[in-house]
Design a protein with these regions (language model features):
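Acidic, PIN/NYN-like endoribonuclease modules and their adjacent C-terminal/linker elements
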Residues: 1-2, 98, 103-127
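Short, well-structured N-terminal submotif of metal-dependent ribonuclease cores
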Residues: 1-39, 49-62
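A generic structural signal for short hydrophobic patches within well-formed alpha-helices
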Residues: 13, 44-47, 78, 116
Length: 127
């Protein structure tokens, strides 16, 4: 799988728990969830803020968050976020997620190619 530290983006988690990922992508995420995986505090906020999830999805998301390691918004992430915002047309939450990956040397698993693909230093895994 390459790098061993993975940050799972909100869109991938939502698709995964909504059973909307292709089978191959679902199996890939299954393998990652067996080990240690990461999310950003932004992912936590986004996941818990969704209104359109059913009870089963809500329970799965809460378990997903509880079993993850959450990166908080630390000073080095803030500094990297500012650099990203100055260099790319990217929304603040996505800039924080990208900065979190860069600072912590994580691969980002996301389907948000439009925003993240333009950051050359970011190791992006597209599902």
């Amino acid at each position: 799988m390459g790098r061993k530290d993975f940050l799972i983006d909100t869109n991938v988690a939502i698709y995964y728990f909504g059973l909307a990922l292709p089978k191959e992508s679902e199996k890939y995420i299954d393998q990652i969830l067996v080990g240690k995986y990461f999310i950003s505090v932004i992912n936590r906020i986004e996941l818990l803020g969704f209104k359109e999830i059913n009870k089963n999805e809500s329970e799965a998301i809460n378990s997903f968050i509880a079993n993850s390691t959450i990166f908080d918004l630390e000073e080095d992430i803030i500094i990297e976020t500012i650099k990203i915002r100055k260099n790319y047309a990217i929304k603040l939450p996505d800039a924080i997620i990208a900065a979190t990956c860069l600072v912590n040397n994580c691969s980002l698993i996301s389907n948000n190619i439009k925003d993240f693909d333009k950051i050359a230093r970011l190791h992006l895994i597209k599902l």
